[in-house]
Amino acid sequence: MKTYAVLLALVVAFVCIAESTGYPVEDLEDDELTELEAEALLEDLLEDLELEDLDYNEEARSWASMAKKLKEYMEKLKQRAG
């Protein structure tokens, strides 16, 4: 029984110390963006980052040229087969 009293006294002492030296708790829920606000912000950022014309993008140009070459090759194969 003595050990329980000592443990209880220690717990109470730790709680009192924690409350007296507690750090200020920030209310993060008020400062955080709601999901809808965050989604709207991300959409705006994505719109700003989108490229107007992908042909000016080096990677898009290379893919476009590869697709064009593939179409030409397929047409030549059809002509030879037909």
Curated annotation (Swiss-Prot):
Pfam families per UniProt: Latarcin
Maturation and modification: Cleavage of the propeptide depends on the processing quadruplet motif (XXXR, with at least one of X being E).
GO molecular function: toxin activity
Gene Ontology biological process terms, A to Z: defense response to bacterium; defense response to fungus; killing of cells of another organism
Keywords recorded for this protein, A-Z: Amidation, Antibiotic, Antimicrobial, Fungicide, Secreted, Signal, Toxin
Tissue: Expressed by the venom gland.
Span of the annotated motif Processing quadruplet motif: 58-61
Domains as described in the record: The mature peptide (62-81) probably forms alpha-helices which disrupt target cell membranes.
Purpose: It has antimicrobial activity against Gram-positive bacteria (A.globiformis VKM Ac-1112 (MIC=0.7 uM), and B.subtilis VKM B-501 (MIC=2.9 uM)), Gram-negative bacteria (E.coli DH5-alpha (MIC=23 uM), E.coli MH1 (MIC=28 uM), and P.aeruginosa PAO1 (MIC>45 uM)), and yeasts (P.pastoris GS115 (MIC=23 uM), and S.cerevisiae Y190 (MIC=23 uM)). Does not have hemolytic against rabbit erythrocytes. Causes paralysis, but is not lethal when injected into insect (M.domestica) larvae.
Protein name: M-zodatoxin-Lt3b
